[in-house]
Amino acid sequence: MTIAAAEALTRCIEHREIFHDEMLHLMRLLMRGELSPQIASALLMGLRVKKETVGEITAAAQVMREFATPVVTPNPQDLLDMCGTGGDGSHTFNISTTAMFVAAAAGVPIAKHGNRSASSSSGSADVLEALGANLQLTPEEVAECVAATGIGFMFAPAHHGAMKNVAAVRKELGVRTIFNILGPLTNPAGAANQLMGVFHPDLVGIQVRVLERLGSRHVLVVHGKDGMDEASLGAATMVGELKDGVVREYEIHPEDYGLSMMSNRGIKVSNREESRALVIEALDNVDGVARDIVALNAGLAIYAGNKADSIPEALALAFETISNGSARAKLEEFCAYTRKFQK
């Protein structure tokens, strides 16, 4: 079913939903660059003001997946992504990227989808390069990396070439649009399990239901009530969980797991080198907020990756993996393996 751009804009103005097939059609036009910049920007802003629905986001994510360059692995049902929306303005170090090494060392196969910094001081790609990883990998090399090390990193621009058709409009608008929440929904390896941080509390329930419709297996969508797009030590964390086909929403508190409430001030960074230093500090088991917040998020990842039956069990495994040095060893193994492919 198609829809004229004018009708779609009218729906947005009147706060009425654009139906699934109609949204598929509009999104394909956007991704092919077949809408004028004026219509494209009006549509993106109309959706933002109206507030995108679960159905609209689901359809848009399906089209982005359709246009993506895939990474083919034998068992996408076992893979876990740890990709957040970003945009929380907290300027903390790369917590989920660090937690990735802990989860992988605990046996969770990781297919992480990431990018350079947009609003933070250091994006996942920035800090991984600072740590010595080579990110210029083909899809086949990423798949080989997953098979050999348990981790693959997919640099978003290399897998979403069609995004160039909306890049100029997004840049000129300079505000958040639906594309800011689509990235974590469009893993090129089709990872069925996910730990996703979101920048706004409303997105917890929205994103987990989108992933339910997209066929995900086990998902945790989190938002720290202090504003972080991670599980936080500074406040309670809102969680939306999809497991066994059922969505639940609840809160977790650091003290529930024997962790101290701590301010995030000590983990703020201004560049990728400062972030790199905290990544190493956390993985070297230095007592403090960096290690504990990484362990908390890694615990959630281990649980979402189905290597533990509960969050407390997963958190204990995360701390063990850090303290015995296997998480730090996983970092070195991953970086060394990616450098094999340097041209």
From Swiss-Prot:
Any single biological process term in GO: L-tryptophan biosynthetic process
Binding site for Mg(2+) 2: D229, E230
Molecular function as annotated in GO: anthranilate phosphoribosyltransferase activity; magnesium ion binding
Cofactor comment text: Binds 2 magnesium ions per monomer.
Residues where 5-phospho-alpha-D-ribose 1-diphosphate binds: 84, 87-88, 92, 94-97, 112-120, 124
Binding site for anthranilate 1: G84, N115
Keyword DNA-binding included in the entry's annotation: no
Binding site for Mg(2+) 1: S96, E230
Pathway(s) the chain acts in: Amino-acid biosynthesis; L-tryptophan biosynthesis; L-tryptophan from chorismate: step 2/5
Cellular component aspect of the GO annotation: cytosol
Function: Catalyzes the transfer of the phosphoribosyl group of 5-phosphorylribose-1-pyrophosphate (PRPP) to anthranilate to yield N-(5'-phosphoribosyl)-anthranilate (PRA).
Protein name listed in UniProt: Anthranilate phosphoribosyltransferase
Gene from which this protein is expressed: trpD
